[in-house]
């Protein structure tokens, strides 16, 4: 009886587990904007940061990576085009406007009110 229960549970776990496929993300922003001036920086941006780190979705999903990234940028006071890009990416990765607003509000108490205000 116990073996049957264990086998049934194991089958349920296997059937219920979502396996995230690791797909390489293609990014060309670095090369497009900095390729001639700083080719190594562009390569690291496009191939390592986006091509490798962001593509490790089997370790951390894109939605969570977006949450971490926008939180990090706002906490540092970075509200330029980088934040705009990552907020758009966060929406594409399933984060809603309501969640973004709540994230920024939450950050205000840890990173500082002016940084959060600037992010809105």
Residues covered by each model-derived region:
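Short amphipathic alpha-helical surface patches that mediate protein-protein
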Residues: 88, 105-108
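Sec-dependent signal peptide recognition
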Residues: 2-8
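C-terminal binding/interaction regions
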Residues: 107-111, 119
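Compact alpha-helical subdomains of small soluble proteins
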Residues: 95-98
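Acidic, glycine/proline-rich low-complexity segments that act as flexible tails and inter-domain linkers
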Residues: 19-65, 75-77, 84, 88-92, ...
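Short, structured motif recognition centered on aromatic/hydrophobic residues
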Residues: 64-74, 83, 100-104
